[in-house]
Amino acid sequence: MRVVTTAQPLDVQPTPLALLLLGREADPKSERGVECPGDLPSPSDPDLVERARAAKEKLGDKVFILGHHYQRDEVIEFADVTGDSFKLAKDAAAKPEAEYIVFCGVHFMAESADILTSDDQKVVLPDLAAGCSMADMATAEQVAECWDALTDAGIAGVTVPVSYMNSSADIKAFTGKHGGTICTSSNAKKALEWAFEQGEKVLFLPDQHLGRNTAVRDMGMSLDDCVVYNPHKPNGGLTAEQLRDAKMILWRGHCSVHGRFSVDSVNDVRARIPGVNVLVHPECKHEVVAAADYVGSTEYIIKALEAAPAGSKWAIGTELNLVRRLANRFAAEDKEVVFLDKTVCFCSTMNRIDLPHLVWTLESLAEGTLVNQIQVDKETESFAKLALQRMLALP
């Protein structure tokens, strides 16, 4: 199974534009993790705002722009809808009249949109180098080797794969082919409950922290019920006995942004802001989740702040762009919202989608040139869609 990424044609140049062409003929795996230079990148040239508006107006209903919560403000301004990756993919599928789906997010999100939309719709990623370090931590070859290890241990037949939405199309297809389902950070508990009705064990991909937090915090398992499979070690670094004894086989993957938060971050913010409520994403480490007051997805975080009383104080452990927008939004309601960590840190691959890339994309489409199309091959799409459909059927 393979994922085909196309950018066609490559010889078209828009009008003069300060554009870093990393997303054209670039390796999507060339940049991983996060950068913490101390501040967010400077806003792009304000003259580009009018060009973006003009190109979008020219395209009209032919284009539908999706903006992930972690995108820059200058990109979110032009999004028709915002949300998490699964919500945006569903929004795209519900807009069949749009010929072009411009996904302002990262590579696996655009793949999911291509899987769920019709063949007539074309999904475009403004910068092909906007990858995801977590999704890159589980390749099809590595997961196949893991399944072989489970087979050798005699447990593959009783193991159900559950893959996080933040995974490649190949991993989603593997999951569908082997009787598993996809999950989001919002429905991970339901997905695990379903999986344990189908089998005795779960192989959770690729985020170990979401898998562990859901199993222990939400389902009452112990940490001893969980083992971590390291794809860079023979047999995952585990004995056959360890695999047979485990209920949760967690892939050794993580989100580089959420992985930065620590218990020290929690203790420090409590010392600095008396009475603060600490709210973190379940992609954080287990000890951070245990030290927090509340845990939930990006949608949960937004709703929690909407329902919070005036005068309340909140430290949020998730991506900086979203936290900054929430801080600005709720300041008018006398709600103090701060970033959990003192170190200013954002998702560098999300931030590759900037206004210059968006303008280049929209102007190219307006001129009739298809660029940076994301296409998932039919076999991969078929099995990946099966896994997604199982998730949609969860109670």
Task: Annotate the PLM regions.
Residues 2-317, 321-395:
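Active-site loop-to-helix "anion-binding N-cap" substructures in soluble metabolic enzymes
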